[in-house]
Design a protein with these regions (language model features):
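Metal/cofactor-centered catalytic core regions of large enzymes
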Residues: 1-105
Length: 105
């Protein structure tokens, strides 16, 4: 899945499969569903992917959009959606900061 953000808002969603299912789910959410709610870079080499803590595993990236008041945020929405990706690539302003799970900074 590829999410593209501009000014903190989700502007495009692409996926190889099941994109229509996700879009139907996403359309039903109201409020600030397209605002970044959480962004986590996993730094812990002791945590393995596919566990309850996989968002903290070294090389993982977790990003959520929508509701985040439960963690001190300001986004008001009827839900939030979070994706955790192992060996992720993250670009900010066209600069790659994480490539295949390796921090480039």
């Amino acid at each position: 899945m590829k999410w593209t953000f501009k000014n903190g808002k989700l502007v495009t969603i692409k996926a190889d499969k099941n994109i229509e299912v996700f879009k139907k789910y996403f359309e039903k959410i109201s409020g600030e569903k397209d605002r970044i709610g959480r962004f986590i870079i996993g730094l812990n080499p002791e945590i393995k992917p596919q566990t309850i803590f996989d968002m903290m595993a070294l090389g993982a990236v977790s990003i959520a959009v929508g509701y985040n008041k439960d963690i001190g945020g300001r986004n008001e929405a009827t839900a939030h959606h979070e994706v955790t990706i192992s060996n992720a690539t993250v670009k900010i302003d066209r600069e790659t900061i994480i490539e295949n799970g390796k921090i480039k900074l």
